[in-house]
Amino acid sequence: MPELPEVETIVRSLEKHLSGLVITSVDLFKPEVIRTPRVDIFTDQIVGRQFQKKLGRRGKYLLLHMSDGLTLVIHLRMTGRLIYCDADLPLEKHTHVIFHLDNGKQLRFADVRRFGRMSLVPTREVPHLPGIKEMGPEPLDTAFSREYLKKELRRRRTRIKSLLLDQCFVAGLGNIYADEALHEAKIHPERLAPDLTSREASGLHKAIIEVISSGIKHRGTTFRDYVDGEGRSGSYQHQLKVYNREGLPCPHCGKPIQRIKVAGRSSYYCSSCQKAK
């Protein structure tokens, strides 16, 4: 699933192309992709709308702001792609929506797993949408402070890996960047959140910011499905220390990376650097 760095990269790559363009028509091959409003209303409302200069993101949601106070809200889920391209580019097999633009180009939404969803809503309602209104702070915002992190760790008696995946705690983290942050902070993924020391919490806070920033710098992580809004792969997969590296040597100590299940999710870690305690 695209996480914060991937979604941020998509937003930035689309922003430079979509600004000022108008949607002239829509091809909708999978109506179930549209969450709200009703499909016929969605099509009627979005045709003729112009993309604003500044697009946005909240957690893993893309926010494509449009004229007349509307925003196209998109969650890519596991395998969604949103690509700006030439109209004559061969169609991907799992293309579900095509937005035709007034410069002759297209914005295409494709999704192999078919879990991705989009909604067209008044911009003022975006902060109140289910899935967004409950979100915690963005990891690169000042609201995600060391003090916030330490306070939340004390009051949530759950495994730290599970907590990092909770979007109500911090927005945008997923399996990849949670594992990388825990490794950087030398914290075992099964440690209980309130058991972390003040020093460990500070180290985790720093690690989260560093891995997210690095993920954005390298334009996200590509294994199979993820590409940005121009169809380009990311490169953060070449920077990974533990994620998806089971059996390979830890770059810090040389011990083999291990994989365990935490809350039903695969977690990669180094048993030497990240002690269970």
Curated annotation (Swiss-Prot):
* Documented EC number(s): 3.2.2.23, 4.2.99.18
Zinc fingers classed as FPG-type: ranges: 241-275
Q: Which residues form the active site?
A: P2 (schiff-base intermediate with dna), E3 (proton donor), K60 (proton donor), R265 (proton donor)
Biological process terms from the Gene Ontology for this record are:
base-excision repair
- Cofactor note text: Binds 1 zinc ion per subunit.
Which cofactor(s) does the record list?
Answer: Zn(2+)
Could you say which residues bind DNA here? H94, R113, R156
Keyword Lipoprotein among record annotations:
no
The alphabetized UniProt keywords are: DNA damage, DNA repair, DNA-binding, Glycosidase, Hydrolase, Lyase, Metal-binding, Multifunctional enzyme, Zinc, Zinc-finger
What terms describe the molecular function in GO for this protein? Answer: 8-oxo-7,8-dihydroguanine DNA N-glycosylase activity; class I DNA-(apurinic or apyrimidinic site) endonuclease activity; damaged DNA binding; zinc ion binding
- So what does this thing catalyse? Hydrolysis of DNA containing ring-opened 7-methylguanine residues, releasing 2,6-diamino-4-hydroxy-5-(N-methyl)formamidopyrimidine; 2'-deoxyribonucleotide-(2'-deoxyribose 5'-phosphate)-2'-deoxyribonucleotide-DNA = a 3'-end 2'-deoxyribonucleotide-(2,3-dehydro-2,3-deoxyribose 5'-phosphate)-DNA + a 5'-end 5'-phospho-2'-deoxyribonucleoside-DNA + H(+)
Q: Which HAMAP family match?
A: Fapy_DNA_glycosyl (MF_00103)
Q: What does this protein do?
A: Involved in base excision repair of DNA damaged by oxidation or by mutagenic agents. Acts as a DNA glycosylase that recognizes and removes damaged bases. Has a preference for oxidized purines, such as 7,8-dihydro-8-oxoguanine (8-oxoG). Has AP (apurinic/apyrimidinic) lyase activity and introduces nicks in the DNA strand. Cleaves the DNA backbone by beta-delta elimination to generate a single-strand break at the site of the removed base with both 3'- and 5'-phosphates.
Q: Which family does it belong to?
A: Belongs to the FPG family.
Which PANTHER family would you find in this protein's record?
FORMAMIDOPYRIMIDINE-DNA GLYCOSYLASE
How it assembles, according to the record, is: Monomer.
Q: What is this protein called?
A: Formamidopyrimidine-DNA glycosylase
Organism equals Desulforamulus reducens (strain ATCC BAA-1160 / DSM 100696 / MI-1) (Desulfotomaculum reducens)
The encoding gene is mutM
